[in-house]
């Protein structure tokens, strides 16, 4: 289900552009060479329908929109950080690393239980408990 929302060829790259502050359609298109206007439009529309992005009309003639991440979209920054941490460990060279803002020490992904905040390393993925 999650991969249906963010797993296609361009969506993660578009999300990354929005996370780093690119808001304008043409700037996003320029920064992602090879991405056609119609594909970018379709991806932005799908991301808006999924609740990841909002669009704001800033010019009526011709119509131009700026794009911003919703809170749900901003929460995907953790996914990008985890990918960058993985890249630091497994890609040579890796051009990005995730570090503590104050100490500049490398960081790692840690999982905590939601209620007790206990750190855990043993994870399972199971069907969600959906309340009716």
What kind of region is each of these model predictions?
Residues 15, 23-28, 44, 72, ...:
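Extended, folded domain segments that form the structural surfaces/walls around functional sites
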Residues 58-59, 103:
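Short polar/acidic secondary-structure junctions
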Residues 1-35:
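N-terminal helix-turn-helix DNA-binding core of bacterial DNA-binding proteins
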Residues 26-58:
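Canonical helix-turn-helix DNA-binding module
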Residues 81, 85-132:
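C-terminal regulatory/oligomerization modules of transcriptional regulators
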Residues 2-5, 18, 51-54, 75, ...:
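Short, contiguous, well-ordered secondary-structure segments
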Residues 7, 59-82:
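Basic, amphipathic "hinge/linker" alpha-helix immediately C-terminal to the N-terminal HTH DNA-binding motif
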């Amino acid at each position: 289900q999650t991969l249906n929302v963010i797993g296609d060829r361009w969506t993660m790259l578009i999300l990354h552009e929005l996370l780093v502050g690119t808001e304008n359609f043409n700037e996003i298109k320029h920064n992602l060479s090879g991405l056609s206007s119609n594909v970018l439009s379709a991806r932005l529309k799908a991301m808006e329908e999924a609740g990841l992005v909002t669009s704001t009309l800033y010019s009526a003639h011709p119509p131009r929109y700026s794009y911003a991440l919703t809170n749900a979209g901003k929460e995907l920054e953790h996914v990008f950080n985890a990918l960058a941490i993985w890249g630091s460990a497994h890609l040579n060279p890796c051009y990005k690393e995730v570090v503590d803002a104050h100490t500049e020490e490398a960081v790692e992904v840690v999982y905590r239980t939601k209620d007790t905040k206990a750190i855990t390393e043993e994870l399972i993925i199971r069907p969600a408990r959906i309340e009716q």
